[in-house]
Regions:
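Hydrophobic mid-domain F-helix/FG-region of cytochrome P450s
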Residues: 149, 160-161
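Phosphate-backbone binding and catalysis cores of DNA-processing enzymes
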Residues: 1-149
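Nucleic-acid-contacting surfaces of polymerase cores and analogous helical-repeat interfaces
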Residues: 100-106, 161-168
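Toprim catalytic domain recognition across nucleic-acid enzymes
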Residues: 146-154, 166
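Short, hydrophobic-biased segments on the C-terminal half of alpha helices
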Residues: 55-56, 154-158
Length: 168
């Protein structure tokens, strides 16, 4: 077999093996998912038979997760794999997050991160889903943020992902 065909087969683009998005994503380990619309197509085209709704349903149910598990880039991972992956990568991601924050003079104390985690748990309790902007409004009302600052808000959310508190 030629190398291009082996690659297509391993990427599940030739004779796909899986029917469900979570099976595929788990088998691959992770899929880069920076562009949300395109990653749904990327998953769907690697399944035996799927629609965009099949992939959206797996995301909505939390069977596959879109998160920053490997680096500050979005990836899809199977829900059952997220904890062990976070254990492997969280320290490095936290370090990169902190370095980025310092570069923008956005140093955030551990105390403030802890306060943000408590608020996130409170406002997202019961599988509630909020946008980053809606969460930022809660952070402003509670005094965690003085104003809705996207860079600072991103630091809070990336750190909360690494702690396993939220998953996008």
């Amino acid at each position: 077999m030629k190398i291009p065909n082996i690659r297509l087969q391993n990427q599940q683009l030739l004779n796909p093996l899986f029917c469900q998005p979570k099976e595929l994503v788990s088998w691959l380990g992770a899929m880069q998912a920076q562009n949300y619309s395109m990653v749904k197509w990327a998953v769907g085209m690697r399944l035996k038979s799927a629609t965009i709704q099949t992939v959206e349903e797996a995301l909505r149910k939390g069977e596959i997760l879109r998160t920053h598990v490997m680096r500050p880039t979005w990836h899809l991972v199977a829900a059952e794999d997220i904890r062990w992956m976070l254990k492997l990568s969280a320290r490095r991601i936290k370090s990169a997050n902190d370095s980025f924050a310092k570069g923008y003079n956005l140093e955030i104390t551990d105390e403030l991160y802890a306060k943000s985690y408590n608020l996130l748990e409170k406002i997202l309790c019961g599988n509630k889903s909020l946008t980053k902007q809606e969460i930022a409004e809660h952070f402003c009302c509670s005094g965690i943020l003085v104003e809705a600052d996207n860079h600072r808000m991103t630091r809070f959310m990336v750190r909360a992902e690494q702690e396993g508190i939220v998953c996008s």
